[in-house]
Amino acid sequence: MFSGIVQGCFEVVEVVKKPGLITFTVKVSKKIIKNLKKGSSVSVDGVCLTVSKISGGRISFDAMLETLNKTTLGKLKVDDELNIEKSIKVGDEIGGHPVSGHIHGTAEIVNIERPENNHVVTFKCDKKWMKYIFPKGFISLDGVSLTVVDVNKKEGTFTVYFIPETLRLTTFSFKGQGDLVNMEIDQQTRTIVDTVEIIIKGSDYAK
């Protein structure tokens, strides 16, 4: 489990592609390396991956075909930067919202506005997910816990604001229009919406 509070963005230094699998290595800080071990879970651009190797200040991960097809990791290359967060432990503060690292799909950046002291980004996703996205609700994008500000369900878009600290610590500081990000719907919201739908359908069947 993760909190959606990214601990920094770090550079990919190696990508090894094999049939249905890639192994990639990221150069990280001493703070990230501390207490990490082979088998640890790490959020990498929002995707929960297992550390396969630690060597000096570098950590390696394997990403399988399902992950490559569903997330942006399928297009990963050397010099890319990734948002990294170590998993939280029992008793740790959840500064954002509970994030599992199980990606539902990708969202595209369709607009960026930069009014004074603000960074406003609009995303577009598959409309099937829009029933779970509400103003003031949580969403995880590339592993970052964010609060939705505005929603256009007809267009399949939603808007979020980024504070300067989030931009400083994440890859969103240099992402542009047309870029794709990994999206994880808030599980609590999804459970509530699906439960209500089941109840309503049950009432309809009973009539």
Regions found by a protein language model. Give the residues of each.
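Conserved loop->alpha-helix
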Residues: 1-207
